[in-house]
C-alpha cells in the first residue's frame, strides 16, 4: 500500500527549523526584528514601497477595508469565485458585496465584467489573482482611476507572480497569504503591500490595538511604556517565530516555484489525453507561480461528477482540494442573494478539483496521480 499523497504539504527544511530555534533562544519571540526584516526584504524583493506584516491575509483585508473607511451603505465589487473570507469581511463591516462573474476558463474577472457593476456607492474593487496566475490588472486599474475607486488586489495565490513587466505587489495595494498551503508559508501569516503611505500607516495602527507603534518599537526606541491609542484597533501582528520561517521561505521561493512549474509541466504532458479540463493560461505576458493545479470535471465528458472523482482518488490514497466553492452558493449568501446568477462562476464551482502540487512532490508522484485518474476515467 502506497503512502497517502496529500494535495499540499509545506516545504519546511533545516534552515526554517534553525531560524525558529534562533528566535526561541533570542529572548524576543513576538513581533520584533524578524518581522521588521521580513517587511524590508519583501520591499527589496518585489519593489514595494511599504509592507506591513500581519498574522493572516484575512486580517490584512480586514484592516485595509477599515483603513479605506468601508462601511454601511458602501458597495465592494469582488468575485464570488474566491475564498469566502473577503465576502465575510465586507459583510461584517456593514457594506454590500457586489459579486462579479469570472472568465469561464481562467477563473479571473475583468474590467469588462466589472464596469457595469460600478455605482455611486462603489468604494472598492477587489480582483483576485487565481491559482498563481495574475488577473489582467492594467484595464482594471484604468477603470478604477476613471471613477476614483481604490483597488485591493487579492494576491493570496500570487507570491512570486509577475504581470507583464512587474511583480505582483510592486505597485498599488495587494495582500499576500502565508497560510500553510501557500507557496511561501510560515504556518499562518500575511503581508499588505502598498505605495500609499497613508494607507500603510493606518493599517499599522489598526493591526496593533490602534497604537502608533508595536511592542518592539516601544522597547528599542525608548518610548513611554504606555503608547497612545490613535484609533480602536485589533491584534493582527505577525510574531518573529512566524517571520523567521517566512524569511527563509522568501529566499527559497524562486527555487520552490520552479519545482512547482516542473511538476505542472509533467501534469500537462500526461493529462493531455484525458477528458479533464485544466484552467486556461492567460495570454498576456506573465510569470505563473503555480500555487494550485486545477482541473474541471464535467460529468458529460468524464462520466462522473467532481465529488465522485475526488472520492475515487481518496480511495486510491490521493488527496485533492476544492478551490473554491463559490461564496454566493454558501448557505448564508445563498439565502441573502437568492436571485443572483453568475453562470461561469457556478459552472466552475461544481466542477473544480485541485490535484496534488507541492515542491517536495516527485515526477513519480505526478505519474501516480495521472495513472489513478486514467484508471478512474477509463
UniProtKB/Swiss-Prot annotation:
UniProt similarity note: Belongs to the DegT/DnrJ/EryC1 family. ArnB subfamily.
Residues found modified as N6-(pyridoxal phosphate)lysine: 182
Source organism phylogeny: Bacteria, Pseudomonadati, Pseudomonadota, Gammaproteobacteria, Aeromonadales
Natural source organism: Aeromonas salmonicida (strain A449)
Protein name: UDP-4-amino-4-deoxy-L-arabinose--oxoglutarate aminotransferase
Cofactor(s) essential for the protein: pyridoxal 5'-phosphate
GO cellular component terms attached to this protein's record: membrane
Subunit structure: Homodimer.
Keyword Signal: no
NCBIfam families named among the record's database cross-references: PRK11658.1
Pfam families: DegT_DnrJ_EryC1 (PF01041)
GO BP annotation list: lipid A biosynthetic process; lipopolysaccharide biosynthetic process; response to antibiotic
